[in-house]
């Protein structure tokens, strides 16, 4: 394997150093000022300055192009489109998008915690809160996996295996997801030192009651992520691919961003970038499992780090 040129290594080191300095400056600003707005404005300015510095390098712009536009064009080249499809109304696209709308509506109005509280108002059960998360996760499996799979079973010529559930592309490109996790991990570790983080995670506040509680919650959480990846990066992307090609990614990120409404704005905006990256990788590798691995790995890491600030298992006192 050819070694990267020294100029490339030097550039990467400068970029890593500049990002580190920017992050340190943002955290220094948070500790030095009591003004929330000053911290927010300063963080935005520092972030924009860092972005401008990174994009000022032609080599970096070339790298960005290689992992974005070049990949989308490759997806379009791989997509088999019948000439007869051009300019025609697609019943398949209509069905796919209607199923997406119905499934998301069910999540909001029936599969939510508020709906669980309406249907099961008796909170006296020891595991009432955990059952609430089972309700939430179960509806994700139903709406994101079961309903789409039933839909595909009735669509002529469609095979569920074609909807990015193969492991073949996952193993071949596992290193990409390992690099992504390595980049995300330090950010998660830094975030875990904040009070806001410790008061938010784990979402199941009784996760420290017992090992059974913890791993039951993690299993429900993982099932939800698997379902989400199949729905957005499998069912929706592959369902639209023949007619839209790589443009299907940009259709997908709209509802994917919207399911994050109600969360902090940085997380919701971050979902746009995450959707683009995971969508591109899913279409290129024809596998959703990398996205599942990233989601489950990051979520489990966040919970484990958050548990450091929780009372001990069996103490009778719960997280946040």
Where are these predicted regions, by residue range?
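Aromatic-anchored segments of alpha-helical transmembrane domains
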Residues: 19-29, 101-109, 123-125, 182-191, ...
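Membrane-embedded alpha-helical segments of multi-pass membrane proteins
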Residues: 42-48, 138-147, 211-215, 219, ...
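Interfacial transmembrane-helix boundary/kink motif in multi-pass membrane proteins
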Residues: 3-15, 67-102, 123-138, 158-187
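Hydrophobic alpha-helical transmembrane segments
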Residues: 12, 16, 94-98, 173-178, ...
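Alpha-helical transmembrane segments in multi-pass membrane proteins
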Residues: 33-53, 88-155
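Membrane-interface helix/loop boundary segments of multi-pass membrane proteins
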Residues: 166, 227-251, 280-287
């Amino acid at each position: 394997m050819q070694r990267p040129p020294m100029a490339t290594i030097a550039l990467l080191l400068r970029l890593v150093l500049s990002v580190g300095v920017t992050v340190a400056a943002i955290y220094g600003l948070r500790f030095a000022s009591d003004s929330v707005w000053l911290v927010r404005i300063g963080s935005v300015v520092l972030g924009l300055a860092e972005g401008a510095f990174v994009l000022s390098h032609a080599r970096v712009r070339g790298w960005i192009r290689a992992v974005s536009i070049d990949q989308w064009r490759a997806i379009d080249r791989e997509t088999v489109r019948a000439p007869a499809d051009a300019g025609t109304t697609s019943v398949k696209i209509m069905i796919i998008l209607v199923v997406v709308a119905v499934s998301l509506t069910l999540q909001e109005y029936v599969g939510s915690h508020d709906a669980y509280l309406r249907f099961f108002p008796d909170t006296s059960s020891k595991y009432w809160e955990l059952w609430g998360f089972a309700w939430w996760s179960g509806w994700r499996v139903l709406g994101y996996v079961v309903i789409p799979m039933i839909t595909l079973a009735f669509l002529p010529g469609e095979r569920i295996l074609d909807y990015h559930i193969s492991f073949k592309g996952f193993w071949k490109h596992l290193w990409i997801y390992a690099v992504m996790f390595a980049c995300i991990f330090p950010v998660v570790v830094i975030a875990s030192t904040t009070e806001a983080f410790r008061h938010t995670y784990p979402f199941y506040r009784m996760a420290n009651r017992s090992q059974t509680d913890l791993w039951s919650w993690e299993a429900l959480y993982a099932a939800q992520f698997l379902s989400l990846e199949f729905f957005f990066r499998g069912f929706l992307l592959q369902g639209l691919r023949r007619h839209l090609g790589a443009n299907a990614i940009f259709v997908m990120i709209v509802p994917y961003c919207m399911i994050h409404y109600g969360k902090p704005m940085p997380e919701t905006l971050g979902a746009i970038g995450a959707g683009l990256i995971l969508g591109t990788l899913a279409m290129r590798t024809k596998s959703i499992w990398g996205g599942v691995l990233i989601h489950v790995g990051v979520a489990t890491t966040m919970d484990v780090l958050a548990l450091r600030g929780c009372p001990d298992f069996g103490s009778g006192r719960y997280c946040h």
